[in-house]
Amino acid sequence: MGRFGRLQDVLRSERFRPIPFALVLAVAAAIGTRGGVDLAAPTPKAAIARALSAHGIDASAEGVELSTFVVSRRPRSLGSVEVALVRGRSPSDDMHDLYMTFVRRSPEGVVLEISAPVNLTSSASVDEGAPVVSGPFVAYTTALDGAPKAIHVLDLRGHPAAESADFTSLQKLQSAGTEWQKTGLSQGIVHDVYTLAGDFTEARLAFRGDALDVGLGGGTKVVLDPGSRRVLEGAELLRVSLAEKGRPAGLVPWAVDRVRSVPAFGDENMQILKAVAFTGLEWAEKARTKVTGGPTVTAETPSGLEGLSQVTGGTVTSTRDPEVGFPPAPLEPILKPALPNEGTFVALENDPFITPISGVPAPFAQTFLRADPNRTGTRIFITMWDARVIALHMEAGTVEPVSATGEAGPGTIARTPEVLRNVVAGFNGGFQAQHGEYGMQANGIMYLPPKPYGATVMELRDGSTAMGSWPGNSEVPDEILSYRQNLTMIVQDDKWNPWNRTWWGGTPPGWHDTIHTTRSGLCLTKEGYFGYFYGVDIATEELGRAMLRARCRYGMHLDMNAGHAGFEFYSMAQGTGFSPLGRPLQADWEYEGQVKDFPDFRFRARRMIRAMGHMNFPRYIRRDERDFFYLTARRVLPGPPLDPGAAAWRVKGLPQHGYPYAIATTTARVEGAGSAIAVLEVDPKAVDPKDGANDDPTTVLALADRRGDAGAPTSPGKTALVLADGRFSLVAREKAQGTPLFTGNDAPTPATRAVVGVRDEDGVLLYAEIARDEPKRADALAGAAALLGRAGASKHVFVANDVAALLGGGLALDGERDPVPHGPVTVRLVRRAMPGGRPYFESTPVVDVSVWRPLQMQRVRYFAKPKPAPSPSASANP
């Protein structure tokens, strides 16, 4: 191997990397400062306020509260150490923060010693109010433009041991070290946030016994119980965010964060240290190459597809269904000669580590590319997914991003069956807030406002995943539910780095960044697919080169460095568990366990590639300190079999007019029926209602009353089936908006030949039709209704008339031409675009560095969103 190769391996080794950081951390931990005390101050509170001025904090005695919570009690001659909470601000800032300091007083109550203050809030955009204290509990408000926005409650007793019961011993030690550095208390401080849901002019706090009363003016109030962390009164006025510990990072990333948090060292020095270390490794690699004449293939760079598919049983694709269009076409390798299967996608069919999606082609595919001619041993691995079938979501961590309003994220995927049963993957987010304060909003909660011209991925309210460069303002369109920003686009308009950025996170700002390290990225392809990119020992230019070769329309940089970047697949099972794998789990990249806080669910997890060295595997299915993305399977047709006795769903050869499928048909035998019944399901997200009088080439389903042997139509039913807001629903006919698709009753009429219901979970229409010559008509209709109930439709009605349900406007449910006469079409369901991947903010121009950089360098500040002006006809509304 040679001495350079051995040196590089030592420098890369896990046992070496923590050493310099641990040494610096030990020195930093020994540094302590004690503020001078004015013994002549008239009151202890005045003494504390004056002492903080030595630390550059403006405070008054009125903004100081002493907690009866005693941190430690020494012999009475030395006094006890108590906690003081202080509302203060920097002289150059008009916003207050909440500071905490430890105070030692004499037996007579004279302040003898004060520790250096700790800023508990550091919120850039809201003003913290004066604290109120009761025992270990501290409460205060935050305000924006003078209006209260949230109530914050602190518990100085810290986090209960149960929150970290599943941590390793090392993780518990790390967690205690982090809390000690942040607060001076190894158990930390519990910080719950109760955000006000309405507009109020005041929020007056007062502890009354064990409860916290919050007066909101006009007789309105909320009451909180800090001890049980419950809302006793006014829950409808609050959005509650209860703090819980997230799992700490791996040892090396954790040590780096702890050192950069030491004021005497700081982030800039850490960036310099990292840049020097990476440059040294790069030098060692070049020197080694000169000696050995060949590239290094590290343990984290598998030589080909085996790191992706040797266990999963993936299928190398050569053809694809033109109706579906996924997996993507193979990618042309960048370096020649190409390695076997380089650029060829592996479809992850029947993968035991991905939650199954019935009836559709595999929505995930993987490949790899080499992009650096000087490092031909490195790989950039790509996982691509079909955004029409897979939805992207994002969640804030319990620590990152550090919010400008003081609100922390939950750090977990929502613990509800509706979400968990559809989770298929998770992966890392972007940079920490201190490295640019790039915007983030999750599920409508804004943690950091958007930066102008920032590279942005979004979840829209219709479920689509979008990507684009934010425009030059910070307004968030109502259509956007969630967004995450990071830097500027690596790739846009078929160009690498069109924004001419020079800093990509590997060096101090202002240095030219060509650092080779572990990097990750996300892209939207020209076909509308999304891809996650991961490479070890790569620079941003190589990442961008791979994105361009993958036909990315937009490409953005995500988090970087070993331990921070990672992608995991998940398979979720509720209740019954999994089918056996038939082999032992491979612990270096596979895992099976129970979902914490939701024991009814079990999960299997697998890293995207076997050698992916990210921290805390499995990471994203647990509670995490940092923000992350997760993927869920959309509810698309055809889904699982209707009934054990039902035939397979049919989707091919039907008038779908697009993908995912709009309709599916099957047949089933039901008890009491002489013949099989025909069943149709319609996805409400795939169709729009339209007047039946006008033909439409994208007609999926047309409805008409029959004439002929059924005679004239009977009276309409009392219940109507309608399509609105992306769901079918059954409503009283007199309340139906627009033309009902069907009307029906609780009992069949002489003309009834069909039953309709709506699946509770997703609003899908289920329509069951008996044969025209069915000899046991009543029994068949009853059996059809029971079948819809087993399929998830808790409500159903018997269609009042003999209705013709015509696929494409003329076909019976078996796909053949309907021979029975019918009247004019009354309503059509025509194809509509479904949620998927799409570009956003396409009109944002690429501007010069001199325009975007000053805007992105500004510290975030929130501004009250202007209320919409009333419409001209508002005064006429009742």
PLM region spans:
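Gly/Ser/Thr/Pro-rich low-complexity, intrinsically disordered segments
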Residues: 13-878
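N-terminal Lys/Arg-rich, disordered targeting/topogenic segments
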Residues: 1-15
